[in-house]
């Protein structure tokens, strides 16, 4: 029984897809356990970029099983489009498995997402308008439609009719918006269900059988700990639990079967959308990091907010997700800066604190306390070991590990597979 969970430790976009792809080489099953197509991950293989939103990064290994777990909310339209994209690129999807218990995102979820966001005005959350929140709302309200329901023509029609009638009343009476047509949705989405039917199964059985047989299973989280609905910067969060604990609920695997948790972070911090960001940069340094790091959302294309590395955030993520190993990405983006900064604590009303406040009002008053380190000018994209890094870059990597309190297993100096350097094998340490 060998399993590893990969989680983002910041606000998403840390390079989880890259690290999942890297760790997938030694895994036999790769599974997603939460989120939906609001998440985007980019994998670079032989210089070619692949952008995925729903399908796990392990799909590029045809001999390995890729699982979309029950905790994921699935937009069938997006999934069918993503499958076609992979097929056009010559990638087989015969190794994909989709949980019959996963909930379905339908057009009324997306319309409601947009209407709710518009109604918030200046208090908007910055949602991707993918229908994720409303789909999870229906799930919690016990009126959601699952993949198993989508495949049953009569059940799907019955539940869609009930749900759509309720949503249309909401659209017309509360939002003065156009109602949606039952026939159009039913025909389109039932057809999508038939297209994905071959992949649908009880994925909990697949995952538990694999673990019981001693196979290596890799769990891939979406978004990041700071977007977790319980542990993140609420309400500027996603609607699911990206933390490692989400694996047990979102995949149907018990907590006793989790061995290691790899936290993925960048050598700086980024965030898409609204919400607290204590180390955010608004100057030319921030603009430089954004451009060099290509900090634009995979899903939205929106420019990401960027800032210095925040060890307060990282220690919070370590605690609530039980992180055992750290993967540090994008060190190369900081090359060329005379000075690099790391936030080591916050100043809250004149008092030094080293924890991340739950209160948004307190967070607004938090000022980062920085430790400054000398930068490096060298191009490090060709570095293949820690010793090859310039001394100042090496010191930066070590200091990050010290402040977070977790051993760094890998560091990356670029987006390619070959640019991920191993300091300690996660699989071998189990």
UniProtKB/Swiss-Prot annotation:
It catalyses: IMP + L-aspartate + GTP = N(6)-(1,2-dicarboxyethyl)-AMP + GDP + phosphate + 2 H(+). GO terms for cellular component: cytoplasm. GO terms for molecular function: adenylosuccinate synthase activity; GTP binding; magnesium ion binding. IMP binds at residues 13-16, 38-41, 128, 142, 223, 238, 302. Its cofactor is Mg(2+). PROSITE patterns: ADENYLOSUCCIN_SYN_1, ADENYLOSUCCIN_SYN_2. Binds 1 Mg(2+) ion per subunit. InterPro entries: Adenylosuccin_syn_GTP-bd, Adenylosuccin_syn_Lys_AS, Adenylosuccinate_synth_dom1, Adenylosuccinate_synth_dom2, Adenylosuccinate_synth_dom3, Adenylosuccinate_synthetase, P-loop_NTPase. It is found in: Cytoplasm. It is an enzyme of class 6 (ligase). GO terms for biological process: 'de novo' AMP biosynthetic process; IMP metabolic process. Pathway: Purine metabolism; AMP biosynthesis via de novo pathway; AMP from IMP: step 1/2. Keywords: Cytoplasm, GTP-binding, Ligase, Magnesium, Metal-binding, Nucleotide-binding, Purine biosynthesis. The active site is at 13 (proton acceptor), 41 (proton donor). Homodimer. Belongs to the adenylosuccinate synthetase family. Plays an important role in the de novo pathway of purine nucleotide biosynthesis. Catalyzes the first committed step in the biosynthesis of AMP from IMP. This is Adenylosuccinate synthetase. It comes from Streptococcus pyogenes serotype M2 (strain MGAS10270).
